[in-house]
Amino acid sequence: LAETELVSLATTVGTPYLTNISSLSKGGTILNISLRDLGPEVILQCDNVVDDVDHVCRAQTSPHLAEQQVGHRDFIRCSLAAILSDKEPARQTDTDISIFSPFGLGILDIALAQMVAKLAVETGKGVKIPAFLPEPWAKTL
């Protein structure tokens, strides 16, 4: 992991198993897709970005466990929206390890849909639907 800049966690675990990330390269990014792999101690030592603070701090996610441990959410630096709207920098420093925890983003749905659409175009399979909404709805928009 010392030379790895990006780690994506996508598992079905219910309790954290990663409690030490000292071997991860400085300035790396962890995509906390499955939300329960990282121990609270890892969350608390990293730069945390989330899609929705209220969503991510529930259901025994890693950020939720960190919140329970320290009694606040101050370890979450900002939301993805704050970064995309230039209200916050993407990174605090070049050496911090950043964790992105996307609870309500549907990131896996988006990734799968992109892959399916790409394969459909490449193989010439599938049916293109010109409009998603029924015609009466489309006229009112």
How does the language model describe each region?
Residues 2-33:
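Rossmann-fold NAD(P) dinucleotide-binding segment
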Residues 15-17, 38-39, 57-58:
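Short glycine-rich, flexible loops that bind phosphorylated cofactors or substrates
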Residues 1, 25, 39-44:
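Short loop/helix-cap segments at secondary-structure boundaries that form the rim of catalytic
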Residues 41-140:
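Adenosine-phosphate binding glycine-rich loop
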Residues 2-4, 138-141:
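Short, solvent-exposed polar/charged micro-motifs at secondary-structure junctions
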Residues 10-12, 33-35, 52-53, 102:
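Fold-independent oxyanion-binding glycine-rich loops
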Residues 17, 31, 35-36, 98-100, ...:
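Preference for short coil/turn "hinge" residues that link or interrupt alpha-helices
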